[in-house]
Amino acid sequence: MKVSVLITLAVLGVMFVWTSAAELEERGSDQRDSPAWLKSMERIFQSEERECRKMFGGCSVDSDCCAHLGCKPTLKYCAWDGTFGK
């Protein structure tokens, strides 16, 4: 009983690896092109100018954050600075 379970699991593992390799071979060009596509998307988003960082946005100084938000020094994110008003 134990041997048949182990053999079944081994066969399923081999089939999984075989089908994964065949799938990667079919769409291999897509995999190679995807890093370039991701880099171009990153450039698009970095080129946008932002007025201020909203809540939980990354920052380096308080002036990066929107009104009533301050840059937390430990984790470098914008959080409420405890002030109210317009």
Swiss-Prot record:
Expressed by the venom gland. It is found in: Secreted. Pfam families: Toxin_12. The modification Phenylalanine amide is found at F84. Keywords: Amidation, Disulfide bond, Ion channel impairing toxin, Knottin, Potassium channel impairing toxin, Secreted, Signal, Toxin, Voltage-gated potassium channel impairing toxin, Voltage-gated sodium channel impairing toxin. Residues 22-50 form a propeptide. Its main location: secreted. Negative results: does not show effect on Kv1.1/KCNA1, Kv1.2/KCNA2, Kv1.3/KCNA3, Kv1.4/KCNA4, Kv3.1/KCNC1 (all expressed in oocytes), voltage-gated sodium channels (Nav1) (from DRG neurons), and in a range of voltage-gated calcium channels (expressed in rat DRG neurons). In addition, does not show significant toxic symptoms when injected into mice and into cockroaches. The presence of a 'disulfide through disulfide knot' structurally defines this protein as a knottin. This toxin acts as a voltage-dependent gating-modifier. It inhibits the sodium conductance (IC(50)=124 nM) and slows the fast inactivation (EC(50)=1180 nM) of Nav1.5/SCN5A. It significantly shifts the activation to more depolarized voltages and decreases the deactivation of Nav1.5 currents upon extreme depolarization, but only slightly affects voltage-dependence of steady-state inactivation. In addition, this toxin causes an approximately five-fold decrease in the rate of recovery from inactivation and an approximately 1.9-fold reduction in the closed-state inactivation rate. This is Kappa-theraphotoxin-Cg1a 5. It comes from Chilobrachys guangxiensis.
